[in-house]
């Protein structure tokens, strides 16, 4: 469920997480909102929230009945899937920064031990991802924006960010 404006960080994060955890997810219109969204996103309050849900309220017969419980409706697998979607969303919000490359032009990766040699087993696609990531670190794009441009889940970039920061190839833009 999008926020009233539909373009907040929570909207972007929710779509990104669901794209990678449930490719068949459904995007509802703001006009399909429930009472929480009506209150939190109302003019004058305008909290920029989007809603992530496994099944939309009111769209299953057990909704708001005694059967809407941990036995009949909510399964351990469903609860775990919801947990991981929300955890990933919170991680993205916490780690979403802008990064800037610290050198002019493409950095020389070999001297930093980051470019594969004949004796290393780094897959070529990892090198391509690293170089493409660096090319987008202009200080203007956030991590989630870069992930979207690279068509990868944001969480698959966390180790790369740490590696490049540790080698002082990129830094966070404050």
What residues fall within each predicted segment?
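Secretory-pathway/membrane protein signature
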Residues: 1-174
């Amino acid at each position: 469920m999008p926020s009233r404006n539909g373009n907040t960080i929570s909207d972007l994060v929710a779509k990104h997480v669901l794209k990678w955890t449930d490719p068949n997810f459904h995007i509802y219109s703001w006009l399909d909102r429930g009472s929480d969204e009506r209150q939190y996103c109302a003019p004058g309050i305008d909290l920029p929230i989007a809603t992530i849900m496994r099944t939309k309220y009111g769209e299953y017969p057990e909704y708001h009945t005694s059967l809407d419980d941990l036995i009949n409706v909510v399964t351990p697998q469903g609860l775990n899937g919801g947990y991981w979607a929300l955890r990933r969303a919170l991680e993205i919000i916490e780690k979403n920064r802008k990064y800037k490359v610290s050198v002019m032009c493409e950095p020389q990766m070999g001297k930093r031990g980051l470019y594969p040699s004949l004796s290393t087993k780094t897959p070529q696609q990892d090198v391509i991802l690293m170089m493409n990531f660096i090319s987008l670190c202009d200080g203007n794009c956030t991590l989630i924006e870069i992930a979207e441009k690279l068509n990868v889940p944001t969480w698959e970039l966390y180790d790369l960010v740490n590696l490049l920061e540790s080698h002082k190839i990129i830094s966070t833009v404050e």
